[in-house]
Regions:
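Acidic catalytic patch
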Residues: 16, 40-44, 67-98
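Short, well-structured N-terminal submotif of metal-dependent ribonuclease cores
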Residues: 1-38, 50-64, 132
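A generic structural signal for residues located within well-ordered alpha-helices
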Residues: 5, 104-105
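Acidic, PIN/NYN-like endoribonuclease modules and their adjacent C-terminal/linker elements
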Residues: 86-99, 110-144
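A generic structural signal for short hydrophobic patches within well-formed alpha-helices
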Residues: 10, 43-46, 127-128
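Conserved beta-strand segments of alpha/beta enzyme cores
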Residues: 35, 77-79, 138-140
Length: 144
């Protein structure tokens, strides 16, 4: 099974001082966490937040952020998932459980994982509600 890493997981993997770095990096180092996927949304989110320095790190320079993404995507086991299918199609089974604007991206990433027969890897326990019973198998909550 392929794991689509959400943006928070991507950021934590770049910040050894983050409170969840150890459990996330331990999970990521396990062979069972491979293959792993990124998509345009998670890649651009990672770049944007590294540039802002929002993780507690100093803001990355543009080339540093690009290099960080290159290193990540060059790792063995990486798969790129394009943004297909369209948003409305991928969130159709999830849409009724969405509770607000903060879940729109999560819903799409979960829908993308479902479409690709994978799992969305996240720390966000609240996403279980969004998945419902029928999509619970498509979520990997990384324990902290």
């Amino acid at each position: 099974m392929t794991f689509l890493l959400d943006v928070n997981i991507l950021l934590i993997l770049h910040d050894p001082h983050h409170q969840h770095y150890k459990p996330v990096s331990r999970w990521f180092a396990q062979p069972s966490s491979k293959p792993f996927a990124t998509c345009p949304i998670t890649q651009s989110g990672m770049i944007r937040l590294l540039l802002q320095g929002i993780t507690g790190l100093d803001p990355f320079a543009m080339q540093e952020a690009r290099d960080a993404l290159d290193r990540l995507t060059e790792q063995p086991g990486h798969i790129f998932w394009p943004d297909t299918p369209a948003y409305l199609h991928s969130t159709k089974s999830i849409f009724a459980r969405m509770q607000g604007h903060r879940q729109t991206t999560d819903a799409y990433l979960l829908g993308l994982a479902i479409h690709n027969h994978g799992k969305l890897a996240t720390l966000d326990r609240g996403i279980r509600h969004l998945a419902g019973k029928e999509s619970a198998a498509n979520i990997e909550i990384i324990e902290t």
